Amino acid sequence: MKPVQLVMNSFITKPIQTIHNKPLTTVNVVLYYVKSIEEKVNLIMTEFVVYDAMMGSGKTTQVKEYILQNPNERFIYITPFLKESYGVVGINFNIVGDEAVPVFNDLTNDIDYDESNPLSRLRFKYPDRKKGKGSKENSLSHLMNIGYNITSTHQLFTHMSINSLIGADQYTLIIDEALSVYEETNLVSQKEVTRLLKIGILYLDEDGITVRFNRDKFGDNVKLDTDKTEGTSYEHLAMMCDLSQLLLIDGKTLVWEMSADMLRKFKKVIMCTYMFEGQLFSSYLKKHGIEYEIIKFGKKPSEVKHLFNVLDDKKLNSIGASETALSKSFFEKEPTKSTGRDACKRHLNTVMRKWGAKTDNRIFTCFKKDKTVISDVRYNKNWLPFNCRATNDYGKVENVAYLVNVFPSPTLVKAAKGKETDFDIEIHTLTEMLQFLYRGCLRNDLPMNIYIPSSRMRRILFKWLNSDFEYMKVLNDGD
């Protein structure tokens, strides 16, 4: 078949013979290019705004006001946890085990809403597996198709199929805290990746990291038609390659990347976070050429510095003296019963007793693998993941132990950076630490006792409190 080349509204296409491995016909060529132009228009029209403010500075209030001022718009509001999202949009819920379960109103045959919450008037819905024939993704897609306001989680949104976002161009997407847009994946073993690259079934795009699937080669090797991966163990791999969602880092590690077109589908995107420029999500947007506006407000570090009662004890801090002490690699190099873990266990107990911290007035973090050894029975219920965020359940806690030294995954940083993007590891580390500390009473402008044995983490925290980051100086100069 002779290659086809179309020129429409200045969008020049390359000669093609197939679309998604299907032979060209007049009908599917027209539909394909109409869809392509529609997507390019959406690329231009999507507005991306970041509300950048310290935790407890009123970002959620800003979002609520925006929604109330634009009641005729359609909204999708996503958070890390459903409990927080239900509270924001006015859905009553009960806690069953560890899960937030919405209350159903038998009189209205609908969700039970908190009428004292102004957003309850907009009658937000949530994805329901039962109504989606066993799939929350199907349910969310159905709700979008009808045009409801919707609340959901990061996890569901980031792993949706782009084809499920029906009518997204009519919606404003509101994201509470940055999305996790990269994950290391074991979809295919490293050995299998090497083999598939060698025989040409997989190959790398021009950027040197995006993985592509060659169906022609696949057919030659497994004796299937050239456009058939359906029903094979490679079907999902091929689909993810089609969506540009697999990256190969350092020639060995496969990384899943959320499709940037997921965001481009929407009319507008609003994200609420703090120090956005220090997050992988910021690098991700730059890498994909998505422009954004940052609106900053709220307090400066100097205004809250007096609330941070950071323990200054040479003996108790000695376990974190070196630059990499208490990091993930530091603990991985030690045996399970190690000097570092045992010291953390002893010092955690010493510090909490020193502060007179009762069970309901203390939290701590360490890496999950070390939790059992460090927490013991006494502190087991006080542990939270070091990357915990977007929960207000611990707003009265006054005593916090931060027993980690956080470095971003080098693999994910390489995935996010691309060739032109800078990434500040210290700012990333700072944002992770602040998110955890602000789960406690700091978010309510109350003083907190803080134990951070890592000398590196303390240095970064004080650098922020003194506004010594160049990034912070730029922001402060702009006030």
Where are these regions (language model features)?
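Positively charged, amphipathic N-terminal segments that serve as targeting/anchoring signals
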Residues: Y51-M54, V96-V103, Y113-R129, L197-L384
